[in-house]
Amino acid sequence: MKREYQEAGGSSGGGSSADMGSCKDKVMAGAAGEEEDVDELLAALGYKVRSSDMADVAQKLEQLEMAMGMGGVSAPGAADDGFVSHLATDTVHYNPSDLSSWVESMLSELNAPLPPIPPAPPAARHASTSSTVTGGGGSGFFELPAAADSSSSTYALRPISLPVVATADPSAADSARDTKRMRTGGGSTSSSSSSSSSLGGGASRGSVVEAAPPATQGAAAANAPAVPVVVVDTQEAGIRLVHALLACAEAVQQENFAAAEALVKQIPTLAASQGGAMRKVAAYFGEALARRVYRFRPADSTLLDAAFADLLHAHFYESCPYLKFAHFTANQAILEAFAGCHRVHVVDFGIKQGMQWPALLQALALRPGGPPSFRLTGVGPPQPDETDALQQVGWKLAQFAHTIRVDFQYRGLVAATLADLEPFMLQPEGEADANEEPEVIAVNSVFELHRLLAQPGALEKVLGTVHAVRPRIVTVVEQEANHNSGSFLDRFTESLHYYSTMFDSLEGGSSGQAELSPPAAGGGGGTDQVMSEVYLGRQICNVVACEGAERTERHETLGQWRNRLGRAGFEPVHLGSNAYKQASTLLALFAGGDGYRVEEKEGCLTLGWHTRPLIATSAWRVAAA
């Protein structure tokens, strides 16, 4: 029975024991052959790759490198991580020693469609923010989003072509390995110059990553899965921009420079989404904040800087009516104070190019009874190249006075600061003739007194010097703003509102001027506006980035100046309705002047844009004992 079973078993098994032994030997021989075929160098590293599969594995590794390299050349770290972030981090790759299968599984994951872009968060709350900073004035928390990536925003709603992972035949794949690869910026795809691939699948396990040719991009985009497109809402971005500026200023005030640095990096991206004046003023405030955060102060004045400052001042005079208004209203007050006087003396605390005085000289020349003898003392800072710029201004004014037959005398006083002036410097030279009429003095200051507030006691000394010469009138023109607050956040907020209105007026005035009189080719209309913006930008930088004696743009309001001058022994002089009417007429003649407003405030005149006063002119005299 046993033999029969064995025979039956043998016949049913299809072979004898000898045959089974030979099969076992063949299997062992095959395994040994496979072990001998494994690449020894990779085997030493723990990877089992047969020599016959080396070409296929090398091709797959090249494809994986190209696919992962498309994350962006401009920002390799963050961009590459963002591109392959959709790889399943929890995927278990069984037997990682099988390098060929492992790489192929990673390629299959890369070939999967990208996850959709999450929708933009609502304006009120941004869940993606990584830091929360309290807004200005304790008005709440501003949750600011991370800086927007320009590649994720578009204004044109068109299909976005995605990188295509397509299979290729072996011959094309072999040539692809020999060609030079290109890496382009984020959103573009890597391509091989000599490889050709189809959008359909192939029999080969190898694959290459390349951009679809132009003829097939439309079809590829149509077949690709829909990707949400983030469209920038300029109004929402504008709100976020203001929040970012205020939050950065608060972080600076709290000396949290890490948060301030993170916020200041978002401002240029948010400002780029805006247009017109908002973009420009935000750029200047962003630069000023960056200078303060990184402790990079503006360089000291040089020869080029001094000449450039004079050039900016001249362009600001031409582009907008603020300096014209200041000169006109001050001259009107001086002209009325000089009525009936035959010897007059004007002390100008900041003569610059002397643009204010030709109009006054002409008005005096047309006065009934003939012009008086006119003496002008111009005060200015020393020039870095040691040139006598003040004397050059005097020569030009003397030539003009000669043409209109006005007896004119000029003297220039070089002073690093107005606090260096003494009363005897402003008195007439030589002994006064007893038979001559005493000289009537007027002191004029246009945007000069606020600089003295950077030095303790300097303003009081200058006002004391002015009081000692007993002028008949003192004209003061200053910015109508409080940029001298001890709180940096309050000062920043006030200056942001002030200069935003100032930039709006430049935009509105230039557009109105272009409609009435379009500039000729190569004209200076655009240049005047650009240089005026730089003129204001330098003030912004000084208000925000500087502290201590370096911060000279310490503007104060009309009420604050009223208190300071009152304590120094001066009383206000009413400018009168005549000056108001003439100033309004001047603005009517200025192109684009519809938005400018002249207001009379407690005997003073202010010029502003719509409802916001921007500069104020006041007149003063020595108070009666």
Swiss-Prot record:
One of its GO terms (cellular component) is nucleus. Changing residue 510 to A: Decreases protein stability and enhances gibberellin signaling. SMART domains: DELLA. A motif (DELLA motif) lies at residues 39-43. A motif (VHIID) lies at residues 344-348. Residues 1-34, 167-209 are annotated as: Disordered. One of its GO terms (biological process) is regulation of DNA-templated transcription. Residues 189-198 have a biased composition (Low complexity). Signal peptide: none annotated. The DELLA motif is required for its GA-induced degradation. This is DELLA protein SLR1. It comes from Oryza sativa subsp. japonica (Rice). The lineage of its organism: Eukaryota, Viridiplantae, Streptophyta, Embryophyta, Tracheophyta.
